[in-house]
Amino acid sequence: MQIYKLLSVLLEYPDQELIDHLPEIPEKLAQCADTDAAEEAALLQFIDYLASQPLTELQAIYVQTFDMTAENSLHLTHHLFGDDKNRGPALIDLGELYRDYGVEVVTNELPDYLPLILEFAAYLDDNEAMVFLSDAHKVLKVLSDNLREAESPYAGLLSIVEGRATLTRLAA
C-alpha cells in the first residue's frame, strides 16, 4: 500500500533527496486510493511544513525529536522493553518475519524502526497491514500522544499510523 511507503519516507531523517522530491509527493498522495480526507490533510500539512523550513532546521528538529528524546524513539521495542534482555528476541522475531515474507532489509536500522516497519507494511494487503500494525497499537498511541503533547510537526504522521493500527478499520 502506497500510503505506508509514503509515511515511511516522511518519517526518515530528512535529506536533500526528500526535499528535491517534495513537489512529487502530492501527486503520489492523490494516487493513494486508500486515504481519507483527514489523512490527506495531515500529509499535505506536513509536506508544506517540510517545504517551508531549511534542511538544516528540519534535520535539527528530527534529531531533537526522535534521537534525543527517548519517549519519542522510532524504535518501537524500546518503548516496550527499554534495554531489557527481552528486546533482543523481539527484534529477532521481527527480522525473521520480514524474511518469511521475502523482504530483504538493506539498512543499518534495527527491524523495529518505524519507517522500516511501515515499508514492510507497504508489502502487505490492507487487512494484513492493519493486523500487523495492530500489534504495536499501544506503543504507536503513546508515541502519537507524546508528539502531539510536544506540538511536534510529526504528530500528524504518527496519528495516521496509529489510526491505521486499529483493527476496527477491518470492518470498514
Regions found by a protein language model. Give the residues of each.
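Charged, alpha-helix-forming regions
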Residues: 1-112, 119-172
